[in-house]
């Protein structure tokens, strides 16, 4: 039979194992010379995307399914947090040949 001290230690270890949070990542996606880089990226719900526009004109990151629509001013960075899992095709509304895919895990 386990002692009270041993049971308390086991309970604390079990709670500690459950309380370890997953760390959200910050992922940088760059728009430069009319190209989105990387063209394919993986992330998780809760991660932050840093949309970096290095061009001298505005761009957007517009999800084809409507999940997000971010406008990034020239030479600026915009951050957004991912809230929904799925594979999202997105593009720049101003420059429709700029396309990429973001795969978001739960």
What do the PLM-derived regions correspond to, one by one?
Residues 2-4, 13-14, 19-106:
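Extracytoplasmic copper-binding redox domains, predominantly the cupredoxin/blue-copper superfamily
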């Amino acid at each position: 039979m386990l002692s009270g001290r041993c049971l308390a230690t086991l309970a604390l270890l079990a709670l500690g194992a459950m309380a370890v949070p997953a760390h959200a990542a910050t992922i940088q996606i760059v728009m430069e010379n009319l190209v989105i880089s990387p063209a394919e990226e993986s992330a998780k719900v809760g991660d932050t995307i840093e949309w970096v526009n290095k061009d001298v004109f505005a761009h957007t990151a517009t999800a084809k399914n409507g999940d997000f629509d971010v406008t990034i001013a020239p030479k600026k960075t915009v951050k957004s947090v991912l809230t929904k899992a799925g594979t999202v095709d997105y593009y720049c509304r101003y420059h429709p040949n700029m396309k990429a895919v973001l795969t978001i895990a739960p």
